[in-house]
């Protein structure tokens, strides 16, 4: 289970904030929630998803999710991926929809990554001499440096403030 929290240098502050943030937002996501959401998005837009990652943007008030998706093809401009993501996540996790309705969570932002972005990120991690068992798909972005690495690979953004 992924508890949405903000990564901080001070470990005690981080733990306290993580516990408080998860109760404040009420949104606890499982990997199953995200797999269901990604399948639904893929079906709605008619393009397969290669990979995805999420970042809980707690610097935004109220907090929001930044979602990075790599598709196996082009997405039509008629789709608002941010709205689709929030609709589908609200369907599988009612708390997300509730928090959106009462203003405790801002609408999500979805970033479409350029082709092969996920592969590039894994290769960069391998070059950093991370052990082989740690070079894996990153589902939860937990640092500003990793967020910057993802932002460098954005092809298009959807959502308010994107």
State the predicted function of each range.
Residues 1-162:
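AMP-binding adenylation
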């Amino acid at each position: 289970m992924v508890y949405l929290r903000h990564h901080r240098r001070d470990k005690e502050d981080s733990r306290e904030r993580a516990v408080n943030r998860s109760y404040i937002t009420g949104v606890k996501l499982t990997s199953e929630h995200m797999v269901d959401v990604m399948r639904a998005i893929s079906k709605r837009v008619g393009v397969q998803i290669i990979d995805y990652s999420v970042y809980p943007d707690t610097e935004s008030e109220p907090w929001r999710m930044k979602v990075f998706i790599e598709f196996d093809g082009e997405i039509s401009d008629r789709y608002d991926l941010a709205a689709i993501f929030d609709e589908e996540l609200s369907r599988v996790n009612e708390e997300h929809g509730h928090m959106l309705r009462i203003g405790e969570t801002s609408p999500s932002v979805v970033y479409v990554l350029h082709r092969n972005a996920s592969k590039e990120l894994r290769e960069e991690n391998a070059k950093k001499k991370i052990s082989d068992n740690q070079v894996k798909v990153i589902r939860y972005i937990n640092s500003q440096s990793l967020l910057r690495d993802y932002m460098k690979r954005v092809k298009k953004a959807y959502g308010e403030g994107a």
